[in-house]
């Protein structure tokens, strides 16, 4: 993200320290992908979009944190998990006011994303009140994400729950 609210290397290290991992397991966060819908970085955006699509199709991606404008672009393009179905009851209740709902072409409404404004990455950093930060950042889970239990754990970590 352009404000470095979600620095992958730091999040990877901090989150991994909260997990019990075997030698074969590792936590990977990738912030090298960049989607610019304004056309400023069109070649890089196309490459990032292709990589993101490939990760989703191969079911190698657990979640994405992105701006409101990129979520708006992807919400009707990529199938996303319904967070109300994915989250356990206690987490669903705690995060209910942060859910972002979308109605698809068939009229089905699902919780496709989660507003990250009150997460440890944004709240209290000043970014949540900074007028220069022009986007809201959302967490979404592509359909077929391979590690749903880790998604739940990461959200608990993100919101201190």
Predicted feature residues:
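Short, flexible loop/turn elements at secondary-structure junctions
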Residues: 2, 33, 87, 143-145
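Extracytoplasmic/periplasmic/luminal assembly and interaction segments
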Residues: 3-71
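Extracytoplasmic "Venus flytrap"/periplasmic binding protein-like
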Residues: 47-107
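A recognition module on extended beta-rich or small alphabeta surfaces enriched in W/G with H and D/E
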Residues: 103-112, 125
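Long, glycine/tryptophan/cysteine-rich extracytoplasmic
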Residues: 115-137
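A bilobed periplasmic-binding-protein/Venus flytrap-type ligand-binding module shared by bacterial periplasmic
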Residues: 133-147
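Short amphipathic alpha-helical coupling segments at ligand-binding clamshell hinges
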Residues: 146-157
């Amino acid at each position: 993200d352009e404000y470095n609210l979600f620095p992958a290397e730091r999040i990877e290290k901090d989150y991994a320290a909260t997990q019990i991992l075997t030698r074969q397991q590792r936590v990977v966060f990738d912030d090298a992908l960049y989607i610019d819908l304004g056309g400023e970085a069109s070649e890089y955006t196309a490459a990032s979009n292709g990589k993101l699509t490939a990760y989703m199709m191969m079911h190698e991606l657990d979640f994405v944190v992105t701006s409101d404008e990129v979520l708006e672009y992807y919400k009707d393009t990529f199938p996303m998990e319904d967070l109300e179905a994915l989250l356990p009851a206690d987490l669903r209740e705690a995060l209910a006011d942060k859910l972002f709902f979308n109605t698809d072409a068939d009229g089905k409404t699902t919780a496709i994303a989660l507003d990250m404004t009150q997460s440890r990455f944004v709240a209290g950093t000043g970014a949540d009140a900074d007028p220069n930060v022009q986007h809201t950042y959302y967490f979404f889970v592509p359909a077929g994400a391979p590690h749903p239990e880790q998604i739940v754990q990461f959200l608990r970590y993100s919101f201190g729950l």
